[in-house]
C-alpha cells in the first residue's frame, strides 16, 4: 500500500511538472500569435496593390510571358509543402502533409512529381519513408522573412523556366495552411506557376481588405492609375518575379500564424488534461492514504485485542 501511494505521488509530481511546461508553451504561443496576426495584416496592403498593378499590366499586355505560359500536356510537376519545424502543434503539419499526399496522388498517374519541402516536419516525414526530396528549406517556419520567401521563389522560378529534360517542371503547386481565425486553420492548395493573374478581390489579402473602394475595380479602371515605363512588357518582366515571391511570403506568414494558433490550442488542451489528471491522481492518492491509515488502525486495534485476550486473567 505504501509503495502504491508513493507511485501515485511521484506520478502526480511528474504530471505537475509537465503541466508547467505546457502552460509556459501555451503562454508563449499566445503572445507570439498576436505578432503573427499583425504581420499577416501588415503584408496585406502590399500584396493587394501588387496584385492590382499586375492585373492592370496584364490587361494591356498581349504578349505571353514565360511565367504565365501554360503547358497543355505537363510531364513533370512540383509540389511545395509548407509545414512547421517543430512539433507540439496538434494536427497542423499532418493536415498539410495529408493534403499534399492527396494532391500528389491526383497528379501522379499523369506526370512525374518533384517534391519541395519547407519545414522539418515535412522533411522528417518524407525521409522516414525513403522518398526523394528535390529541394528543402527549414529553420524559419514560425518567423519567416521576405528573404526566406525570395530564396524559395528564386528556386521555383529557376526550375520552372528550366526544360523538363534538364530537371525542370511544367507546373508548381503550393500546399500551405490559411489562417482564418484562432480556431480555424485550413490547408489550402494553389497553383503557383504558371501564374494566373486573378482579380485582387479573390485573393486572401483582397478579402481581408474588403470594403476598400479600389478592391472591386476592374483592370480597365485600374489602368488609368498607372503609367508603364518604358512599356507594359518590361514592367511585367519585373512584376511577375515579385508576385511569385510575394505569394510565397504571404503563404509563409499565413502558415506561421496557423502554426502558432495550433500550438496554443494544443498546449491549452495538454494543460487542461494535465490538470484533470492531477486531480484524479490526487484523489487516488488520498484514497490510498486513507486506506493505509484505516489498515494501520485496524492492525493496531486487532493487535490490542489479541494482547488483551492473551493476558492472564486474575
UniProtKB/Swiss-Prot annotation:
HAMAP family: ATP_synth_gamma_bact. It comes from the Bacteria. F-type ATPases have 2 components, CF(1) - the catalytic core - and CF(0) - the membrane proton channel. CF(1) has five subunits: alpha(3), beta(3), gamma(1), delta(1), epsilon(1). CF(0) has three main subunits: a, b and c. One of its GO terms (biological process) is proton motive force-driven plasma membrane ATP synthesis. The lineage of its organism: Bacteria, Bacillati, Actinomycetota, Actinomycetes, Propionibacteriales. Produces ATP from ADP in the presence of a proton gradient across the membrane. The gamma chain is believed to be important in regulating ATPase activity and the flow of protons through the CF(0) complex. PROSITE patterns: ATPASE_GAMMA. The gene is atpG. GO terms for cellular component: plasma membrane; proton-transporting ATP synthase complex. It is a peripheral membrane protein. InterPro entries: ATP_synth_F1_ATPase_gsu, ATP_synth_F1_gsu, ATP_synth_F1_gsu_CS. This is ATP synthase gamma chain. It is found in: Cell membrane. Gene3D superfamilies: 3.40.1380.10, ATP synthase, gamma subunit, helix hairpin domain (1.10.287.80). Keywords: ATP synthesis, Cell membrane, CF(1), Hydrogen ion transport, Ion transport, Membrane, Transport. One of its GO terms (molecular function) is proton-transporting ATP synthase activity, rotational mechanism. The keyword Phosphoprotein does not apply. Belongs to the ATPase gamma chain family.
Amino acid at each position: 500500500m505504501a509503495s502504491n501511494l508513493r507511485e501515485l505521488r511521484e506520478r502526480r509530481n511528474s504530471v505537475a511538472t509537465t503541466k508547467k511546461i505546457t502552460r509556459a508553451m501555451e503562454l508563449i504561443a499566445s503572445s507570439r500569435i498576436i505578432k503573427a496576426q499583425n504581420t499577416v495584416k501588415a503584408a496585406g496592403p502590399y500584396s493587394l496593390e501588387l496584385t492590382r498593378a499586375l492585373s492592370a499590366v496584364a490587361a494591356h499586355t498581349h504578349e505571353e510571358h514565360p511565367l504565365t505560359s501554360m503547358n497543355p500536356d505537363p510531364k513533370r510537376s512540383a509540389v511545395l509543402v509548407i509545414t512547421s519545424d517543430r512539433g507540439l502543434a496538434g494536427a497542423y503539419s499532418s493536415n498539410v502533409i495529408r493534403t499534399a499526399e492527396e494532391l500528389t496522388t491526383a497528379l501522379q498517374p499523369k506526370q512525374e512529381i518533384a517534391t519541395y519541402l519547407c519545414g522539418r516536419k515535412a522533411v522528417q516525414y518524407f525521409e522516414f519513408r525513403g522518398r526523394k526530396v528535390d529541394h528543402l528549406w527549414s529553420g524559419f517556419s514560425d518567423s519567416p522573412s521576405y528573404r526566406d520567401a525570395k530564396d524559395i521563389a528564386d528556386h521555383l522560378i529557376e526550375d520552372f523556366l528550366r526544360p523538363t529534360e534538364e530537371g525542370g517542371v511544367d507546373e508548381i503547386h503550393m500546399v500551405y495552411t490559411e489562417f482564418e481565425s484562432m480556431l480555424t486553420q485550413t490547408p489550402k492548395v494553389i497553383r503557383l506557376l504558371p501564374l494566373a493573374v486573378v482579380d485582387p478581390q479573390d485573393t486572401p489579402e483582397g478579402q481581408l481588405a474588403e470594403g476598400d473602394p479600389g478592391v472591386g475595380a476592374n483592370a480597365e479602371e485600374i489602368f488609368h492609375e498607372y503609367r508603364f515605363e518604358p512599356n507594359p512588357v518590361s514592367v511585367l518582366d519585373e512584376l511577375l518575379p515579385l508576385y511569385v515571391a510575394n505569394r510565397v511570403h504571404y503563404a509563409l506568414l499565413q502558415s506561421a500564424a496557423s502554426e502558432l494558433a495550433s500550438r496554443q490550442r494544443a498546449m491549452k488542451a495538454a494543460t487542461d488534461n494535465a490538470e484533470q489528471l492531477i486531480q484524479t491522481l490526487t484523489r487516488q492518492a488520498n484514497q490510498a492514504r486513507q486506506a493505509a491509515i484505516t489498515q494501520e488502525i485496524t492492525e493496531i486495534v486487532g493487535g490490542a485485542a489479541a494482547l488483551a485476550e492473551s493476558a492472564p486473567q486474575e
